[in-house]
């Protein structure tokens, strides 16, 4: 279980005594780490009776060129500024530069949160 509450240790390394137990709203999850491949999604319950759609892998992107938006096939991840190793592992995150059938594009959506890849052409 990922906990996004306070740390269990002090700056000096000593243990902290917690005043309360862990709560469900402090719960976190492992990142989706969307890869290039056959489309696979996962539905997750979120707060307020909502659902989140996590893209585990996808091979299509909605690419915007000015006002026109078209669907393009993702070939691979060229660069990913969020992590050096994500580019060689073909992991798509927001800000990643992907090679598509329409050309190079920068990802503008969060595929692990929305379940789809939206991108803007950069060349």
UniProtKB/Swiss-Prot annotation:
The keyword Ribosomal protein applies. Residues 7-26 have a biased composition (Basic residues). It comes from the Archaea. One of its GO terms (molecular function) is structural constituent of ribosome. Part of the 30S ribosomal subunit. One of its GO terms (biological process) is translation. It holds the Pfam family Ribosomal_S8e. InterPro entries: Ribosomal_eS8 (IPR001047), Ribosomal_protein_eS8_arc (IPR020919), Ribosomal_Se8/biogenesis_NSA2 (IPR022309). One of its GO terms (cellular component) is ribonucleoprotein complex. Residues 1-37 are annotated as: Disordered. Keywords: Ribonucleoprotein, Ribosomal protein. PANTHER family: 40S RIBOSOMAL PROTEIN S8. Coiled coil: none annotated. The keyword Ribosomal protein applies. Belongs to the eukaryotic ribosomal protein eS8 family. This is Small ribosomal subunit protein eS8.
């Amino acid at each position: 279980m990922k906990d996004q509450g306070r740390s269990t240790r002090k700056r000096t390394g000593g243990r902290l005594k917690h005043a309360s137990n862990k709560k469900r709203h402090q719960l976190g999850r492992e990142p989706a780490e969307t890869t290039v491949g056959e489309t696979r999604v996962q539905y997750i319950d979120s707060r307020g009776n909502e659902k989140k759609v996590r893209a585990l892998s996808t091979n299509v992107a909605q690419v915007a060129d000015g006002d026109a938006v078209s669907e393009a096939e993702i070939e691979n991840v060229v660069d990913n500024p969020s992590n050096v190793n994500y580019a060689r592992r073909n992991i798509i995150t927001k800000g990643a530069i992907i090679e598509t059938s329409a050309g190079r594009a920068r990802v503008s959506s969060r595929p692990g949160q929305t379940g789809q890849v939206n991108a803007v052409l950069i060349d």
